[in-house]
């Protein structure tokens, strides 16, 4: 219980990350811009190509993701660092244990994303002359679903990578993948297939119908669940004693 409370407390570190970009503008005054546009730009960034404005999660806007990785990148893999054979000898069902850890990680991601996006939306409201409307809340909930899935998916990959390679290589591999997908997203702004498959690309998502957006979100969570299931199967067959052999 103490560990869970401590982890919840650590998530509060994202509030300065969410609010800091708006502080300088708050000291100057409000601007004539929609809350929706400011919110999308604050969270995702904006890439413009010709007459078409498309969105990808630009690298400079990934501080919230990096912070979550630093906080929870060893949430599961940390159990393998100190006498893992003794620790896991007391756990009869490895799959159930791993599934619970994934669920707890999901809960932290849900709370963390709410803090980050809530802080960002508050900052946008503080610097905009306009008020949030129906479209603002639509964008908020879409972004919220996306952020939770990305936090869970990438953090699970990092934890599994650290378990497999016994080092922080998993962290590096995950972030190399993120950067590569960012590059692909920018290089294929007008390709709907790549935009759909690539978890880091959201080209035209705000112009999609509810059904199309729902499919995209379901796809992202399918990836996260797939990684979780793979981790459960892998962990069930994993030889814990290998962790204690240098």
Region roles according to the model:
Residues 178-197:
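Juxtamembrane non-transmembrane "cap" segments at the membrane-aqueous interface
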Residues 13-18, 166-182, 223, 244-246:
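Central hydrophobic cores of alpha-helical transmembrane segments
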Residues 113, 117, 121, 125, ...:
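Membrane-embedded alpha-helical segments of multi-pass transporters/permeases
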Residues 1-18:
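Aromatic- and glycine-rich beta-strand/loop motifs that create alpha-glucan
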Residues 75-107:
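Helix-loop-helix units of permease transmembrane domains in multi-pass membrane transporters
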Residues 22-66, 73-75, 99-171, 202-220:
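Secretory targeting signals
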Residues 3-4, 95-96, 160-169, 236-241:
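Membrane-interface helix-boundary motifs at transmembrane edges
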Residues 14-18, 64-68, 204-246:
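Alpha-helical transmembrane segments of multi-pass membrane transporters/translocases
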């Amino acid at each position: 219980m103490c560990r869970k409370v401590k982890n919840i407390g650590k998530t509060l570190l994202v509030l300065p990350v969410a609010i800091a970009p708006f502080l300088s503008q708050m000291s100057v005054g409000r601007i004539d811009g929609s809350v929706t546009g400011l919110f999308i730009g604050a969270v995702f960034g904006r890439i413009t190509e010709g007459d078409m404005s498309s969105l990808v999660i630009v690298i400079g806007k990934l501080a919230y993701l990096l912070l979550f990785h630093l906080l929870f990148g060893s949430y599961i893999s940390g159990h393998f660092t100190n006498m893992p054979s003794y620790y896991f000898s007391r756990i009869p069902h490895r799959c159930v244990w791993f599934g619970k850890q994934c669920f707890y990680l999901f809960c932290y991601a849900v709370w963390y994303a709410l803090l980050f996006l809530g802080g960002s939306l508050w900052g946008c409201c503080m610097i905009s002359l306009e008020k949030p409307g129906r479209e603002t809340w639509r964008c908020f909930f879409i972004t919220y679903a996306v952020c939770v899935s990305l936090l869970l998916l990438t953090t699970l990959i990092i934890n599994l990578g650290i378990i497999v390679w016994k080092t922080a290589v998993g962290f590096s591999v995950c972030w190399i993948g993120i950067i590569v997908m960012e590059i692909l997203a920018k290089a294929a702004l007008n390709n709907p297939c790549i935009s759909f498959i690539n978890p880091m690309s959201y080209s035209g998502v705000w112009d999609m119908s509810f059904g199309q957006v729902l499919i995209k979100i379901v796809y992202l969570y399918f990836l996260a669940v797939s990684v979780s299931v793979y981790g459960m199967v892998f962990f069930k067959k994993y030889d814990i004693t290998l962790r204690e052999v240098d």
